[in-house]
Amino acid sequence: MGAKQSSPAANGRTRAYSGSDLPSATASVNGRTAAVLRYNNSQGASGATSAASASSSAAVASQFISSRTRSVGPSARPQSGINIPNSGAYSSADSGNSTPEEPGGERERSTGAPRLVIGSLPAHLSPHLFGGFKCPVCSKFISSDEMDLHLVMCLTKPRVTYNEDVLSKDAGECAICLEELLQGDTIARLPCLCIYHKGCIDEWFEVNRSCPEHPAD
């Protein structure tokens, strides 16, 4: 028997599926692996981007919260538009000694500082402060407006009479000469029951027409 000859159809079929024309299992596996890696890389990149954006948002939120906390923290105090005046009229010692029930007027009087208000005193109580004069008859201070009337009344007023007597016992000091009234001295007893040495009261009545101790009578 002779050698077999291969048919052209069989050779052509063999060439069509031989060599690099046929996809190998390794190439298929490598292609699938590359696709999986590309998918994983894309997923990882998108995840990293999402994580970065989330972390930046959290940082902004924490910064905003911390700024709000600082602005409304315990050191910040609300300022009211109402200003309460300081009670600077009284010192700390006065405020410590005063009680809540004590009125303001009593606190001012307790300080002992007299307060003079101009016009609070009538003119006839302090005429020497307002251009008054001293009456030569009764030695009283009179305002200028009442000078003429007062002089007429003093000059026309009758002299005070007295009773002459002899002192039976010591009676203290004479208000005119400032000497002692001794037993046996001649005295003058006025209607107001004041007693003086007779010589002292006579000299007094030469200028004045009233008792030395009661000029208004």
Swiss-Prot record:
Record-linked PROSITE patterns: ZF_RING_2
Keyword Glycoprotein: no
Protein name: E3 ubiquitin-protein ligase znrf2
Catalytic activity as recorded in UniProt: S-ubiquitinyl-[E2 ubiquitin-conjugating enzyme]-L-cysteine + [acceptor protein]-L-lysine = [E2 ubiquitin-conjugating enzyme]-L-cysteine + N(6)-ubiquitinyl-[acceptor protein]-L-lysine
Function of the molecule: May play a role in the establishment and maintenance of neuronal transmission and plasticity via its ubiquitin ligase activity. E3 ubiquitin ligases accept ubiquitin from an E2 ubiquitin-conjugating enzyme in the form of a thioester and then directly transfer the ubiquitin to targeted substrates.
Cellular location(s): Endosome membrane; Lysosome membrane; Presynaptic cell membrane
A GO term for molecular function: zinc ion binding
Region of interest (Disordered), residue spans: 1-27, 63-111
RING-type zinc-finger residues: 174-215
GO CC list: cell projection; cytoplasm; endosome membrane; intracellular membrane-bounded organelle; lysosomal membrane; membrane; presynaptic membrane
InterPro entries: Znf_RING, Znf_RING/FYVE/PHD, ZNRF_ubiq-protein_ligase
Coiled coil: none
Organism annotation: Danio rerio (Zebrafish)
Superkingdom of origin organism: Eukaryota
Keywords, ordered alphabetically: Cell membrane, Cell projection, Endosome, Lipoprotein, Lysosome, Membrane, Metal-binding, Myristate, Synapse, Transferase, Ubl conjugation pathway, Zinc, Zinc-finger
The enzyme's E.C. designation: 2.3.2.27
Gene Ontology biological-process annotations: proteasome-mediated ubiquitin-dependent protein catabolic process; protein K48-linked ubiquitination
EC main group: transferase
Covalently attached lipid (N-myristoyl glycine), positions: G2
Comp. bias (Polar residues): 68-100
Membrane topology: Peripheral membrane protein
Gene3D superfamilies: Classic Zinc Finger, Zinc/RING finger domain, C3HC4 (zinc finger)
Gene: znrf2
Lineage: Eukaryota, Metazoa, Chordata, Craniata, Vertebrata
Annotated pathway: Protein modification; protein ubiquitination
